[in-house]
């Protein structure tokens, strides 16, 4: 089979499976409203949980940073791309989250890949929650270490793996809040197993940081644990983009020497670091926004009465509605969009086969009438489809 034949066959199969992904440009889609063409939709697909993506202080910080530093970093942080703005943000994050060091990355995907790739050796083991993010599972699978997946959020399943002898080191990886199911990892139980078996714990808290815990310090803070490696990302509650790895001093120095994704990538613009520093302040002072988000979550869950679909047991901003078949999920998504409600369908391979879903995300910017409109449209869809 030629390259062209292989590519065409893969595309045809995706279309046959109702799993073909299509990007659609818009004129603004991070906030309460999504604008596409001449239509304005209530937006229930954005990860801008606290509504900070248009915050004037953050926008102003980016503008001022661009005026001072320019719009590009000019290179890797090991060459010219590490400015006072980057250093200040790293120190700010480390102090806030209670770690000796923080290292900035251009994305959460890059941070996860870099950490696993730099640490894992052939004699090592990586035990990952079965529903961990693709960046974690892919990095582990591509590493020389042995990858095993434990049952989702089940510490006893992890324990069974940890009890098997090994000559190498063991890294346990999980998410704080899971991106497709919206549930929270039992972090104290996982950490207890790690400590009992001399393993390290790595937590990707992309969907918990900014939302959970005192001042939005995240899932680990809320559950009173401190993993060896904490990954936080800035494309959700912070309203920007990028990521950071929180760790010890020796680990940070190790990553500066061996994390190829860090060494060989152009660093984020200094203006972005300025914006993120302002975003950290907004997150820390965002108690009212977190309260509003919690009220919206409670309102949605209390009002949901759609018996044809399964609403996952999630107390987070992510409210997955399990539909099952890909075609049915697409039909429901399109019906909602026809009614002016923008929700996205998640299908395999992003989620397990047979569990296609609408991934509804709530934000602090949503108003009660928005939630009620969503509930009404879902109720009518149950009777129509």
UniProtKB/Swiss-Prot annotation:
GO terms for molecular function: 8-amino-7-oxononanoate synthase activity; pyridoxal phosphate binding. Its EC number is 2.3.1.47. Its cofactor is pyridoxal 5'-phosphate. Gene3D superfamilies: Aspartate Aminotransferase, domain 1 (3.90.1150.10), Type I PLP-dependent aspartate aminotransferase-like (Major domain) (3.40.640.10). Keywords: Biotin biosynthesis, Pyridoxal phosphate, Transferase. The keyword Transferase applies. One of its GO terms (biological process) is biotin biosynthetic process. Pathway: Cofactor biosynthesis; biotin biosynthesis. It catalyses: 6-carboxyhexanoyl-[ACP] + L-alanine + H(+) = (8S)-8-amino-7-oxononanoate + holo-[ACP] + CO2. Substrate binds at residues 21, 133, 350. It comes from the Bacteria. The modification N6-(pyridoxal phosphate)lysine is found at residue 236. Belongs to the class-II pyridoxal-phosphate-dependent aminotransferase family. BioF subfamily. Homodimer. This is 8-amino-7-oxononanoate synthase. The lineage of its organism: Bacteria, Pseudomonadati, Pseudomonadota, Gammaproteobacteria, Enterobacterales. The gene is bioF.
């Amino acid at each position: 089979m030629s390259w062209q034949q292989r590519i065409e066959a893969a595309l045809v199969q995706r279309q046959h499976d109702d799993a073909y992904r299509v990007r659609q440009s818009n004129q603004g889609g991070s906030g309460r409203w999504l604008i596409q063409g001449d239509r304005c939709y209530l937006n229930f697909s954005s990860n801008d949980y606290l509504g900070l993506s248009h915050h004037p202080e953050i926008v102003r910080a980016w503008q001022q940073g661009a005026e001072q530093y320019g719009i590009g970093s000019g290179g890797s942080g090991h060459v010219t791309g590490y400015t006072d703005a980057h250093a200040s943000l790293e120190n700010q994050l480390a102090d806030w989250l209670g770690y000796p060091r923080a290292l900035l990355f251009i994305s959460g995907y890059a941070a996860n890949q870099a950490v696993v790739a730099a640490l894992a050796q052939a004699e090592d083991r990586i035990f990952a929650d079965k529903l961990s993010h693709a960046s974690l599972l892919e990095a582990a699978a591509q590493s020389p270490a042995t990858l095993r997946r434990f049952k989702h959020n089940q510490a006893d399943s992890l324990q069974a793996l940890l009890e098997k002898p090994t000559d190498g080191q063991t890294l346990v990886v999980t998410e704080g809040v899971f991106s497709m199911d919206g549930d929270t990892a039992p972090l104290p139980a996982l950490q207890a197993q790690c400590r009992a078996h001399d393993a390290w714990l790595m937590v990707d808290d992309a969907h918990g940081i900014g939302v959970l815990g005192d001042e939005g310090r995240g899932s680990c803070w809320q559950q009173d644990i401190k993993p060896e490696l904490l990954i936080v990302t800035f494309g959700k509650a912070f309203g920007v983009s990028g990521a950071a790895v929180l760790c010890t001093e020796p680990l940070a120095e190790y990553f500066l020497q061996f994390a190829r994704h860090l060494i060989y990538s152009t660093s984020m613009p200094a203006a972005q670091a300025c914006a993120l520093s302002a975003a950290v302040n907004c997150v820390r002072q965002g108690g009212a926004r977190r309260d509003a988000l919690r009220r919206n979550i409670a309102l949605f869950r209390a009002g949901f009465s759609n018996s044809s679909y399964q609403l996952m047991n999630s107390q987070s901003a992510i409210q997955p509605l399990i539909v099952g078949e890909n075609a049915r999920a697409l039909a429901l998504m399109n019906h909602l969009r026809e009614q002016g409600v923008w929700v996205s369908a998640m299908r395999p391979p992003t989620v397990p086969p047979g569990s296609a879903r609408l991934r509804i995300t709530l934000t602090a910017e949503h108003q009660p009438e928005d939630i009620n409109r969503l509930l009404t449209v879902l109720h009518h869809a149950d009777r129509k489809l």
